[in-house]
Amino acid sequence: MRRSTDPRNLLVRRGPLLVDGESAISELDPGFFPTGDAPKMSSTTRRRFNLIAFTPGPVTVISSLVYLALLIPLLLVHTIVPSAPKSNPKGVDLSEAWNDLQHLTSGFHPYNSHRNDEIHQWLLQRVGHILDASRKAHEDDAMGSVAPDVFVFDDQQSNLTFSGGGVGNKPITGVYFEGKNIIVYIRGLEDDKENWWDSPGGKPKGKGGVLVNAHYDSVSTGFGATDDGVGVVSVLQLIKFFTSPGNLPRKGLVLLLNNGEEDYLNGARAYSQHPLSKYTHTFLNLEGAGAGGRAALFRTTDTEVTRFYKSSPHPFGSVLAADGFKMGLIRSETDYAVFKGVLGLRGLDVAFIEPRARYHTDQDDVRHTSIDSVWHMLSAAIATTKGLVSYTGSEFDGRAPGKGMVNSGVGTHGVWFDLFGSSFAVFRLHTLFAISVTLLVVCPIVLFVIGIILSKMDKMYLFSIHETIPETKEKVSVRGLRGLFRYPIILVVSSGILIGLSYLLAKVNPFIVHSSSYAVWSMMLSSWIFMTWFLSCIADFFRPSALHRAYTFTWQLLVMWVLLVISTVYVNQHDIAAGYFIVFYFAGTFLATLISYLELFALPNKTQYAREQSQYPSRLGSNRSSRILSPSADELPTGGDNNGEIYDGEEEPTESSSLLGRQRRTTFANYTRTGRDLASSESGTYEDHSETGVFGEEQKWSASLPTWTWVLQFLFVGPVVIMFIGQLGLFLTSAMNQVGADGVGLLVVYIAIAVFSVLLLIPLSPFIHRFTYHVPTFLLLVFIATLIYNLAAFPFSAENRLKIFFVQELNLDTGRNQVSLTGVDPYVQDIIRAIPSASKENISCDSELDSGRRKCSWPGLAPEVVQDEPTDRWLSFNISKPSSQETKDTPVLHARLHVSGKNTRACRVNFERPIRDYSLPGSALDDRMPHTLPQGISEIRLWSRTWENVWTVDVQWDAEDMDELHGRVVCLWSDANQLGSIPALDELRLFAPPWVAISKLKDGLVEVSRGF
């Protein structure tokens, strides 16, 4: 058969041909020329590859690169601590700080331990050495600087009776505490020069000072490197810094090393009784709830004080954590609660937050932190404190926020977050509210107006099914409704799979997130991307639509509008700023949606399009096979039917011909391609798009749409979402992935990861149908691998241990010696079986306490916490005979208890029924912290600064409730520094599996009790 060499008569080609008698050939198949040589083309007609066209290559590459370019830095910021400087900054000695931390953490030092007394004396010596060096530096200073006035208070007088606990109508817990705080006051250049605290009833004058706090006690099972050793050495370095020449504070600075934070914030409460507590108006609290890493800004009282943290060299944190406290999602507390809630100070809480598995365990030591972590907290403390003591305004000198509080003024609620650990944003919550309301109102109006204009111009292809030609009344299909419901279906299915995976992990291997949170993230992300891509490709295959992006962004805008409404309500009614990221998410989505609507102005009006289409015959065939196997009418150079000339460029089929023909090929990603698709794919471009503007089988009017605007849309949405959602997702994971050992259900953790995975990847939805198969296929393999791993892997390791909680209880009435471990079933029973002394004992386990935790007990090795004394003399008490007293309401009975314990300074009294009131002679009372409430007291905790103290406790109760007082006296021992003092604990540490961490269950490691 003779081949035609006239390019106007050829159909089988790699690019479409132009008509009007000109040979505008892009690239002809050389097989159509007898000599095998294709005609040469001018450079003006040669097809070019568009680097930003909305085609598979650019979409896949650009989207992937943007995600990688932002996610990788986020991961690096989250996991790598900025390096400490090689040389010491002025006024700071990092080597000295590290040596101090090593000494501080060389043993357990809870309040109820002899090591605690040693640390107390050592800290006083260190403060003295620092001040001596400071005075010498001022003497040697060539500028003739004068050393500041510095006062050191070894507070051995402050004590307090107060109450804690008690929810609703439940009885409360009474507390008597004797403080052992160390307070250093550096007089500011503008401070009153009088020692007003020496005068009875003396009050400070002038502007309020600044308080920096850290606690030097640890828990009985942790060395306290980050909880709160780094905070303590930071305070020591702050003393050094602000007493150095050139660094003297303008406002007075109080540095508090408090003792007793781990036991219900007792040290901070004792500080409230010191005269200097009336002087400070702002504060910085340094804490730790992890072991190493970055010190995060955990929470703040207001916008104004938060701005001083902005000068930190490496800021880190989000208001999301602060709102977690407000909503009760975070149950642990720090001294921040006392400074803000009792004293009325305004300030910040900076703390280490991960890994929680090391918190309150023997891995909270110097081996698991670094000098980089020390510098991260110290540098933030220096920058923040320097700003506060240099501030001369009156912002923090206003009316008191409450009765009995200092005159610190009232701040505004704030929004704050870091960006890549290098910059910090802070603004008022009211500003967020105003922006939110503006966006909620303006954005829909703008789109509505644009929609009206498009309709007036007859270019509103969205939601259009067909267009009627006015002259002939003929209806021409515009297929503008295609893809309308595609996105919500795909979103629900893909996201629903993640929720299903969350339930699957929570059921099969709930603790895998404890050690392998990144594997869980990888599984969630890869699953969502692959499923969304797969469903989008199927939808695009059967019903291709050029309006896919516009409809997707419209749906996203609608969803984000609803979320922004909810967030705005919480901002207005509850002062919750955690949804701040929704504002940026919504704004980016609106701009992307706006571009999709503006693109429609480039289209011909629908009536004109209908007239043009009515001049051409209908497309050949109505099913998908006609698209695949034959060119359609709009592909013909003249719009004619498929006739004999169609196959003029292909040899007549023979027995040796390919079944599919030379111009069709089946692929995984694009199913069956036509010849022109195949050729363009092989050359890296999709020429049907670059030449005619129509991609594949999308609507023919889409040829007029710009091909580059998708890049703008992606850049408006993608980077903003990645920065905010990625950071918050990592932050939440660090804070929550290891809470299962504390009795918190882990399903909420998996649901949170699933939700943040969806939020993180939603920006890909409008473009993912253009992805090549390579990335989704790779992610499918990642999903399969991580799913298998997450379901089958053992969830704990030596680096990510399971925390169990120890206590040994000795009942002197029955002689029963019981060792107990509280932990997650079935692991806690596996651990007990590894203990030699428990292997032959009858193990009794209580019913489930919370989220799978159980308390299992067995007769254990006898404790040796008191030397050379029989067990029945370890505690002693006596109770006076009750006496009655008439009141206006009911008769009241009184009794006096004398309680003492050997080699301890902590006991408590438990009552079978709540008592009405109690008091201790010589103890201070504070109306800001009532010592009793109407529901009564069920327990009194007693803490003394001296060993083997005798507490005198007066109690009273209603005579109609009980004639006699019944309860138990319990004394506590918490010193595990000496091997052999608690053999049961020593044995557990020796024989427990390496993936087990031991923490305290109660105030004491050993608790000995006797009834009365």
From Swiss-Prot:
One of its GO terms (cellular component) is vacuolar membrane. One of its GO terms (molecular function) is metalloexopeptidase activity. It is a multi-pass membrane protein. The active site is at residue 261. The record marks 359 as: Transition state stabilizer. Keywords: Glycoprotein, Hydrolase, Membrane, Metal-binding, Metalloprotease, Protease, Transmembrane, Transmembrane helix, Vacuole, Zinc. Binds 2 Zn(2+) ions per subunit. The chain crosses the membrane at residues 61-81, 433-453, 488-508, 519-539, 551-571, 576-596, 711-731, 744-764, 778-798. It holds the Pfam family PFF1_TM. Glycans are attached at residues 159, 842, 878. May be involved in vacuolar sorting and osmoregulation. This is Vacuolar membrane protease.
